[in-house]
């Protein structure tokens, strides 16, 4: 069976089960109080809106996807200030066009832009390198690792691949919750964990996860963030060391209805048609893998106060031990 047909068929089963669970949770009033404010790119509203019924005719139309050159996790502005958004978008415009420089005021912003690009413009992150002593006179240098014409071809292939992911599992009228769960299952259905990657010289990046069928945690997490941002759902990376410091792991924090949730599509690769690691609270995330809450590195930028991004809402708890 074609992978995308499989994704669509499974989406129906997943959404039916998830919506039933969510309605059950709403009826018993489980709720939380995560960080509030304008954290969502899409219009989500209350839980009732998240689970609203979409007309059948609208549900059959393909998702009206258009590539968005400017997407960025909102949490980066908390770390670097509001001005980083425009600086990063200037970088995006330059990098997508294959230009060799972009306006950049200082070294902190220059390094931040390349760090942000890992999950917010993976194709540029994969084919550029950070130069020393940048910027110069307010201009940051962009150096590509492949010939310019080849790079431009890679950019177009990347755009086409993002469209493949999104239109393959989403329909017009899908609300933010549906986009979040559908893209989650699309990744977990189509990717295999690359156990050999850490022993090789492969360049690990979210770009590889999006373009190929094999990846590891930091690649899968970044891929999921980017797909969500492209569909107007705010999400960011999150990582931590295990309590005994024996391993590091990276996953995703997603905002739905003003609440933060932990999503771990990498761990889900080892489960059987379930959502054990979907919509986790801080406590559940800590339990699954023994990653102490105090170790959580929100947006992977070192310095954001984890308590300001607390994930405490338990609406998805019924899913964690459910299989279908």
Where are the regions that the model predicts?
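N-terminal accessory/pre-domain segments preceding catalytic cores
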Residues: 2-4, 10-11, 26-175, 289-324
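Hydrophobic core
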Residues: 19-28, 228
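Hydrophobic/aromatic-rich core segments of domains that either
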Residues: 219-289
């Amino acid at each position: 069976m074609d992978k995308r047909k499989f994704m669509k068929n499974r989406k129906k089963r997943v959404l039916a089960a998830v919506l039933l669970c969510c309605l059950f949770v709403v009826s018993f009033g489980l709720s939380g109080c995560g960080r509030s404010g304008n954290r969502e790119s899409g219009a989500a509203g209350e839980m009732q809106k998240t689970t609203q019924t979409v007309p059948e005719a609208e549900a059959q139309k393909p998702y009206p996807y258009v590539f968005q050159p400017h997407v960025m996790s909102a949490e980066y502005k908390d770390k670097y200030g509001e001005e980083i958004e425009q600086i990063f978008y200037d970088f995006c415009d330059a990098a997508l066009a294959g230009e060799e420089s972009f306006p950049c005021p200082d070294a902190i912003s220059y390094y931040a832009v390349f760090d942000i690009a890992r999950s917010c413009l993976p194709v540029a992150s994969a084919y550029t390198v950070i130069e020393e002593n940048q910027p110069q006179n307010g201009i940051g240098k962009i150096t590509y690792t492949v010939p310019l014409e080849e790079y431009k071809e890679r950019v177009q292939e990347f755009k086409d691949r993002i469209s493949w992911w999104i239109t393959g599992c989403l329909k017009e009228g899908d609300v933010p919750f549906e986009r979040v769960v559908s893209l989650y299952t699309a990744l977990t259905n189509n990717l295999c964990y690359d156990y050999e990657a850490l022993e090789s010289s492969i360049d690990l990046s979210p770009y590889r996860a999006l373009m190929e069928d094999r990846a590891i945690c930091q690649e899968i997490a970044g891929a999921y963030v980017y797909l969500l941002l492209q569909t107007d759902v705010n999400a960011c990376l999150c990582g931590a060391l295990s309590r005994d410091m024996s391993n590091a792991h990276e996953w995703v924090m997603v905002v739905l209805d003003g609440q933060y949730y932990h999503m771990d599509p990498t761990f889900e690769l080892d489960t059987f048609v379930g959502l054990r690691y979907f919509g986790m609270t801080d406590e559940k995330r800590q339990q699954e893998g023994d990653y102490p809450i105090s170790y959580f590195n929100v947006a992977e930028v070192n310095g954001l106060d984890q308590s300001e991004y607390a994930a405490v809402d338990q609406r998805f708890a019924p899913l964690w031990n459910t299989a279908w």
